[in-house]
Amino acid sequence: MERGTTLVTEASAPIEAHTDEAQTPPSVFDVAVIGSGPAGSQSAVSAAHQTRSVLVIEAGAVSQRKGRAFWSKSVEFQDAPVFPGITGPRLATALSAWMSAQVGRMVTIGGKPRHVGIWRRGGMVLRVTRVEPDEGVHAPAGYLFAIEASTGALKAGTELTTERFLARSLVVASGFEDIWPDIDVTEGADRLYQTHRILFRYAGNRKGWHVCIRCDGHLHLDEHIAVVASGDFAWSIARGAQDFTGHITILTNGADPDFSDARLETLAARNIEVITEPIAAHIGKGTDLLGLKLSSGREVFADGFFVDYGLKANSEYLASNDGWNLKTDDEGLLVVDEDGAVLGADGNAVPGLFAAGDIVAGQRNLIATAFGLGQNAGLSAADLMREW
């Protein structure tokens, strides 16, 4: 999953605890988690396991917006913990079942009733703000997180269906969007997956587009790999590809290659061609991507196509005009401390705010890494609830 994600089509059911008998959720959750990929799921399970009430808000439940792993439609991950091989959709199903096992319910601990477990809600988070708690409401961060989410269909000309949730802590696990090259785009489309519908036909298949050389390079042992990128992105993929093959071609799609003389010499010594022509169209059969047609009419064929055009962090709901001033890297990913707490621009941890998975700066964007970061953030959020 190196380099993930968390559009809205239909309304979801009210909050449920995923039991035979619906359990009433708390008015204020101990932990809210935005995102239900490996990092979000692990955060939720870890916090629930520590007897906390957890709300998971899942964009994919009400939209076409899916995490990077989900789009591996026919390619099996072989480095996901426990599974010898599993596709993205099957992994998503397994994560869902895992969270559902942490039933939202009431328990009594030390004579005091407490909500514990996981409640899940389909929704696209629009805004997160900090609000003062009502008198008597436990707020270990000094405030509560108010989360506004669209929980109904997004249709032109209709008002948003929104709901507001409150939590004592928040784990951001919404990942990022991969930026895709403009090849065979559908002009006038207003959604990402409509704009790139032809490209997505070939995404996540063995003979198709890949976004992670560490994850999918093994599919093309000693085969021809095409790298569609430029600059550091292209260099990183090409260096990774050498572990799997010696047959590599770089296509910059009209961009300046942006390689130093030393890098160009290294590529030339290994017979790696750098093609700077713009790419005009896909050459495919069914869901298999066979090659790319260039603007000159030249056709370049390969067995696998690895792309990197950068990313867009899914953290727009933490807007500066709502009082958020967070520390990020150059790509907008959140900087955290050793406990998974998000840092403010001043370098200090923001009380109650944590992050995990691909949204975190400076981490390997891999499934196992996401699980580890998720557990760290989930446990840190859970520990914040302790009275002493």
Predicted feature descriptions by range:
Residues R3, V31-I34, P38-A101, A229-D258:
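Beta1-alpha1 glycine-rich phosphate/pyrophosphate-binding loop at the start
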Residues L7-V8, S12-A17, A69-W71, A92-A167, ...:
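A Rossmann-like FAD-binding core segment of flavoenzymes
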Residues I15-D20, G188-L219, Y309-N365, L373, ...:
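FAD-site-proximal beta/loop scaffold in flavoenzymes
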Residues V28-D30, G122-G123, L221-E223:
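Phosphate-coordination loops involved in phosphoryl transfer and adenosine-cofactor binding
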Residues G35, S169-G175, W180-D182, R191, ...:
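Short, well-ordered coil/turn residues at beta-beta hairpins
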Residues G142-A149, L160-L199:
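Helix-enriched interaction subdomains in cytosolic or periplasmic regions
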Residues N205-V228, A234-F244:
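Rossmann-fold dinucleotide-binding core
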Residues G374-W388:
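A charged, well-structured terminal subsegment
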